[in-house]
């Protein structure tokens, strides 16, 4: 008689116990996994918010109010997407700080892919912040996009192209919404590359202990 239930349980234990990670890592190594959880939450809530959002300067703010008041569980989705973005940045800054402290930047491919991820994430957050088209988000869109004019020769042309005209208007909001929607999928692709590069090289050994002691 063979107890297949116990065998499958043992295989599951073996699967988790043979992960290529030594016991010399600490709680600071959790934040990569937490970032993936944040990315999943943001993508799901963002999708449902995009269904009800209207990318029009006259209707954007009203559509946010509509999501919060009229859509079933809309206020949860809206708050989760907003607060989740803050959690995303808290996790990524701790993740980076751990990398700097323990010398993870020596793994150049992983570090450069992570830097690209951070820049893409900051751009995504900016485009998302602008979407309600309230007083603060309109001001932020004006001030931050105007920074492009500081680029020699190309600055004014780039700003006009991003605005979709000579001032911030309806085409600007439409472009920002399109960019905010597509960038998370680019982040997912970059995250996959980041993880593959890490697993190709392996994590560092901060305490210099024998990784086979387990």
Swiss-Prot record:
Transmembrane parts of this sequence: 31-51, 75-96, 111-131, 176-196
Binding site residues for heme b b566: 95, 194
Record: residues binding a ubiquinone: 199
Ligand binding (heme b b562): 81, 180
Cystine crosslinks: none
CDD domains, per the entry: Cytochrome_b_N
Single GO biological process annotation from the record: mitochondrial electron transport, ubiquinol to cytochrome c
Cofactor note (record): Binds 2 heme b groups non-covalently.
Record's function text: Component of the ubiquinol-cytochrome c reductase complex (complex III or cytochrome b-c1 complex) that is part of the mitochondrial respiratory chain. The b-c1 complex mediates electron transfer from ubiquinol to cytochrome c. Contributes to the generation of a proton gradient across the mitochondrial membrane that is then used for ATP synthesis.
Protein name as catalogued: Cytochrome b
Highest classification ranks of the organism: Eukaryota, Metazoa, Chordata, Craniata, Vertebrata
Gene that specifies this protein: MT-CYB
